[in-house]
Each structure stands twice: as structure tokens, then as C-alpha cells.
């Protein structure tokens, strides 16, 4: 079980109509932070076109509560253990769970300045994730599933999905080359698009590194 905390402080100052920026993850460096922000503003050659906000009215937004965030540390550990146990009980061919994770997080953010702006937001999030590895004779496959938000306590659904994805790969084989109708799983479609995403990059096309260069507007 691991816990990590991160605090970040960003400062924006206005000096002679120019904005300077600086950031730190150590609150003790306040004086240095101010000095760096002022120094940054003095290096700017043009007047900033984004004036600082004054006091504003913001609509109150209620974020849904995370069901995992209310659990104790021990309860989260037990939840992870139960996922592994249920995965192995779901199918005798499950021999390992390389990833079995229960994760929660809380975030607080605040914007405040000397002109009256004071806005803040707090959020919490949680997720469970499982990778189930299955083996039959010489074949080994794995399946992955995740649940987030209000569904983060759906352990049974997460386990079933991960195991079914893994088991479904048994007996799979390459098909002959040819032209034929294809049904894409949504994750497979995403992976395929990702493999070719560089082709659609304007920078790659302008450099002549994309096979789509010069084919704009074609179908």
C-alpha cells in the first residue's frame, strides 16, 4: 500500500503591465518564488493581453461522491485481495493477476489574487483495475478491466470482464490475407487508430513524413 501527496503553488505577478510566472512544489520557497516571477515579468517584451480576473460569481458544482474514498486503508487492501481471489475462483485457468489495483485520490485547487478573485474546487476519484492471466496447455493470455466513479465497487463485474477477455483469446489464430468484413472490438479499434495516429499529424504531413501528405480532401 502506498500513499503519495503532492502540493504545487503557482504565482502570477504584474510588473509594469507585463505578467510574470513562477511555480514551486515547496511552500517554504515563497520569497524565491516571488523573485522568480518578477524576474520572469521583466524579461517579457510585450504587454500581456490576458488581464488578471477580478472577483467573479461562479455556479456551485457538486461532484458525485467516490464510493472508494470512504473506505479505510485496510478495507481497500481487503478489496484488492478479494478481486484476486474472485478472479482465480471464476475460472480454473486463471493462474496469476499481474495487476490488481484499488486506487483513490483527492484533489483541491484554489485561485486567489489581490483583485478579489477567490475560487476553489475539491474533487475525489477512485478506481479498481484487474489484469487476469490464464493458461491452457501452452497458451497464455490475459485480460484487463477497470471500473471508475460510481461503478468503482463493481468488483464482480470487473472480475468477470477481465477473465472473459482473457479466456476469449484461447484458440485465436491469424487469418489469411484478403478483403473481408471485420467486426472491431472497441478497444481493438482504439489500438488500431493509435497505431496510425501519426499519419494524421499536421506536422508530420508538412514534413513529408505522412503517407497522407498532399491527399487533403480525398476520401
Place the predicted regions along the sequence by residue.
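Alpha/propeptide regions of enzymes that mature by internal proteolysis
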Residues: 1-103, 150-179, 184, 213-214
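Active-site-adjacent "lid" and substrate-binding segments of diverse enzymatic cores
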Residues: 64-66, 78, 95, 102-219
Amino acid at each position: 500500500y502506498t500513499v503519495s501527496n503532492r502540493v504545487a503553488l503557482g504565482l502570477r505577478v504584474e510588473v509594469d503591465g507585463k505578467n510574470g510566472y513562477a511555480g514551486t512544489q515547496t511552500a517554504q520557497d515563497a520569497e524565491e518564488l516571488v523573485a522568480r516571477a518578477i524576474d520572469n515579468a521583466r524579461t517579457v517584451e510585450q504587454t500581456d493581453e490576458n488581464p488578471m480576473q477580478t472577483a467573479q460569481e461562479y455556479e456551485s458544482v457538486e461532484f458525485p461522491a467516490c464510493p472508494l474514498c470512504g473506505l479505510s486503508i485496510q478495507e481497500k487492501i481487503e478489496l484488492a485481495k478479494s478481486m484476486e481471489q474472485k478472479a482465480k475462483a471464476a475460472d480454473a485457468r486463471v493462474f496469476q493477476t499481474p495487476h490488481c489495483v484499488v486506487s483513490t485520490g483527492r484533489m483541491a485547487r484554489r485561485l486567489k489574487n489581490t483583485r478579489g478573485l477567490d475560487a476553489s474546487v475539491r474533487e475525489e476519484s477512485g478506481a479498481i483495475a484487474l489484469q487476469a492471466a490464464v493458461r491452457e496447455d501452452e497458451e497464455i493470455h490475459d485480460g484487463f478491466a477497470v471500473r471508475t466513479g460510481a461503478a468503482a465497487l463493481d468488483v464482480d463485474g470487473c472480475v468477470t470482464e477481465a477473465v472473459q477477455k482473457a479466456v476469449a483469446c484461447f484458440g485465436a489464430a491469424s487469418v489469411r490475407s484478403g478483403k473481408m468484413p471485420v467486426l472491431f472490438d472497441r478497444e481493438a479499434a482504439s489500438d488500431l487508430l493509435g497505431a496510425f495516429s501519426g499519419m494524421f499529424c499536421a506536422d508530420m504531413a508538412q514534413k513529408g513524413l505522412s503517407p497522407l501528405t498532399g491527399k487533403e480532401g480525398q476520401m
